[in-house]
């Protein structure tokens, strides 16, 4: 008889696909050969995403793992009339629900569980119809999960726009949250993206469990609040499995190190500020000029800045950066004036290799959770510059809850604009040896490095949570659908 399989349904984003594949492989190892993994592949909506996913699938298939297989779902029509990328993705996934149902029902082997992405709550309805336990893989923080679960209650309790509230918002397990730190989906309650956010919080209550890419020691108070039902007004929440950090580390290249890494080799320890705004991070010319001015005036601090160019196609879902034309983007003479202490890199850079380098002492990041986990893993303190989605809430978590970041003042109403003087102040605060604020952030970052690594060791909290998840899936048994 064929092994029971865990069906995994990821979306195509860089911070979603590979962590779910890594989690699937860990399930295989934890089951001791009792389970297999079947990955359902939705067609990516952009050519660049399709190329990335195809390359990742090819690498996995070439690795020779017998117990992980990939199945392609048929294409669906792209939605129109949406008000945000979250709603757009969610509507694509709802269109795929019949395809997911057919793919699972057509499997020859018994099905032990369905693990869906954060956006895939329609798939939980499919799992319920088929009698299969449904889990959500949550690639964000437990703090963000607490906010999501709390959102239906907030929706009923707060009558005005959240930004019009007097005082902070109370999320159990967290310090008081200023409305300015809320995700972009919560800032306009008249938009359908807000309705999607609240509906997602309700939908998660139908899950058998939620698998979170965090370590228990990083967010103990939040995880306790979720487990106690304080985020869901006394109603028991699904079991939460904090199994992170789940990070993918590709093998080192056989050729010589990347040029950015070679440049770092020549710099003193903990002396370089690394600036990178994610795979989709785009900075308009005014922001580029402010960053350049701040770096010039930052007291001689070294920097490595990944600066990307504008996309060829700016339609929804097509915001893919291009290689930057530095002479066109940067102020005249900037590269010459900072020669020797700064490197501006105009295309993709190996972020993990850079953060792992001993020369890196600080990280200006867009606050995507994957990038945050990488900085925590390598013990690099942060200057948070959120751009979109839940990133402002992540920035709040880094500063107020985890303590690994120096706050950076910005004008969210001006597209998250940061003045050069404010960035200069924050850079000096993070990087100067004499800065008390920087010392505290560096010390906390070093602590989180040790916490993250201990958590994933055998017997650590994340390893234990993952084994508990695996045991729970095996214990529940599998359903022969076909």
Curated annotation (Swiss-Prot):
Q: Which domain of life is it from?
A: Eukaryota
> Which biological pathway?
Pigment biosynthesis; anthocyanin biosynthesis
Q: Which Gene Ontology terms cover its molecular function?
A: UDP-glucosyltransferase activity; UDP-glycosyltransferase activity
Q: State the active site.
A: 16 (proton acceptor), 117 (charge relay)
Q: What is its EC number?
A: 2.4.1.-
User: Which of this chain's residues are annotated to bind UDP?
Assistant: 279, 345, 349, 366, 370-371, 374
Q: Which Gene3D superfamilies match?
A: Glycogen Phosphorylase B
- The protein here is known as Malvidin galactosylase UGT88C3
**Species, as recorded:** Oryza sativa subsp. japonica (Rice)
The record's gene field reads UGT88C3
């Amino acid at each position: 008889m064929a092994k029971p399989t865990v069906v995994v349904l990821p979306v195509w984003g860089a911070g979603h696909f590979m962590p779910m594949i890594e989690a699937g492989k860990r399930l295989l190892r934890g089951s001791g050969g009792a389970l297999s993994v079947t990955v359902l592949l939705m067609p990516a909506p952009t050519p660049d995403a399709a190329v990335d996913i195809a390359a990742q699938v090819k690498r996995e298939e070439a690795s020779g793992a017998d117990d992980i297989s990939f199945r392609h779902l048929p294409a669906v029509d792209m939605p129109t009339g949406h008000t945000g990328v979250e709603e757009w993705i969610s509507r694509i996934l709802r269109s795929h629900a019949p395809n997911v149902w057919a793919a699972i029902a057509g499997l020859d082997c018994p099905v032990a569980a369905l693990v869906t992405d954060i956006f895939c709550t329609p798939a939980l309805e499919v799992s319920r119809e088929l009698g299969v336990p449904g889990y959500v893989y949550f690639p964000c923080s437990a703090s963000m999960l607490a906010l999501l679960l709390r959102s239906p209650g907030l929706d009923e309790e707060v009558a005005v726009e959240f930004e019009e509230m007097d005082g902070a918002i109370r999320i159990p397990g967290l310090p008081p949250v200023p409305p300015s730190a809320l995700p972009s989906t919560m800032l306009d309650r008249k938009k359908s993206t807000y309705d999607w956010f609240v509906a997602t919080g309700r939908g998660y209550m139908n899950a058998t469990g939620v698998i979170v890419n965090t370590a228990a020691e990083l967010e103990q108070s939040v995880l306790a609040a979720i487990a106690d039902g304080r985020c869901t007004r006394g109603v028991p929440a699904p079991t939460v499995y904090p199994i992170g950090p789940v990070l993918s580390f590709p093998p080192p290249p056989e050729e010589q190190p990347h040029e950015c890494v070679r440049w770092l080799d020549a710099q003193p320890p903990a002396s370089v500020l690394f600036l990178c705004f994610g795979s989709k991070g785009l900075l308009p010319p005014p922001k580029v000029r402010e960053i350049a001015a701040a770096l010039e005036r930052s007291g001689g601090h070294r920097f490595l800045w990944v600066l990307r160019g504008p996309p060829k196609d700016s339609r929804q879902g097509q915001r893919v950066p291009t290689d930057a034309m530095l002479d066109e983007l940067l102020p005249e003479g900037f590269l010459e004036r900072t020669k020797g202490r700064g490197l501006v890199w105009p295309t993709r850079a190996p972020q993990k290799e850079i953060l792992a380098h001993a020369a890196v002492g600080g990280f200006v990041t867009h606050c995507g959770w994957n990038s945050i986990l990488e900085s925590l893993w390598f013990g690099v303190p942060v200057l948070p510059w959120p751009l979109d989605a839940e990133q402002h809430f992540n920035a709040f978590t880094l500063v107020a809850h985890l303590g690994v970041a120096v706050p950076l003042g910005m004008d969210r109403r001006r597209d998250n604009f940061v003045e050069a003087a404010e960035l200069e102040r924050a850079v000096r605060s993070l990087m100067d040896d004499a800065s008390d604020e920087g010392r505290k952030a560096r010390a906390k970052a070093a602590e989180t490095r040790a916490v993250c690594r201990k958590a994933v060791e055998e017997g650590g909290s994340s390893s234990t949570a993952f084994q508990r998840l695996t045991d729970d899936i095996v214990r529940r048994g599998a359903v022969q659908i076909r």
